[in-house]
Design a protein with these regions (language model features):
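Alpha/beta catalytic cores of group-transfer enzymes, especially the acyltransferase/condensing modules
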Residues: 1-140
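Acyltransferase/transacylase module recognition
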Residues: 103-197
Length: 197
């Protein structure tokens, strides 16, 4: 990924307190301030909850978008400490390398439904799964829609596996009827087991 966007040339920022459509419009406005051949890019990268959208792109364009969005009423525009502008079109070169690797990676049909975060679909075909994994490297994470799709399938509790509890917290902010539980160590495993018993 660092080959695609060298450290220090890309950026991400969380935009808080603003509707995602306003964020998208602000990104377009920011990008329009640069020459079309400048290579400056800023896009919505993560739709985390109804009032939090993460933007990503080239450093100058992200900074300009933050300036525009704060002036337009965003409560906060927080630069994120990341090494690359993930889920943006600048990651396409890295995605192409990922696609090559995925072509030779065995993938079986899931035994439980998995909602992918790029088009909010449940893929069961190995090639569809590969394509979704490829596209998610340079396309936005549609977490708000994923949570709605998971709920529509009858889920009431979402378990976040891995370090931290960001998604569990976002889930609660997206839909208060859902429970989000983090699972990252023996103590949280016990909590999840108790909650699901």
């Amino acid at each position: 990924m660092q080959d695609a966007v060298p450290v220090g040339t890309g950026a991400m920022a969380a935009i808080l307190g603003m509707d995602s459509q306003q964020v998208i419009a602000g990104c377009a406005q920011a990008q329009a301030t640069f020459a079309s051949d400048s290579g400056e890019v800023v896009e919505a990268a993560n739709f985390n909850d109804p009032a939090q959208t993460v933007i990503a792109g080239s450093k100058a364009a992200v900074e300009k978008a933050c300036e525009i969005l704060k002036a337009a009423g965003a409560k906060r525009a927080l630069p994120l400490p990341v090494s690359a502008p993930f889920h943006s079109s600048l990651m396409l070169p890295a995605a192409e390398k990922l696609k090559e690797r995925l072509a030779t990676t065995p993938i079986a049909a899931p035994t439980i439904p998995v909602v992918n975060n790029i088009d909010v679909a449940v893929n069961t075909d190995a090639n569809e799964i590969r394509e979704a994994l490829y596209r998610q490297a340079f396309g936005p994470v549609r977490w708000v829609e994923c949570v709605a799709a998971i709920k529509a399938r009858g889920a009431h509790t979402l378990v976040e596996c891995g370090p931290g509890k960001v998604l569990a917290g976002l889930t609660k902010r997206i839909d208060a009827e859902l429970t989000g539980l983090p699972l990252f160590d023996p103590a949280t495993l016990a909590e999840v087991k108790a909650a699901l018993a």
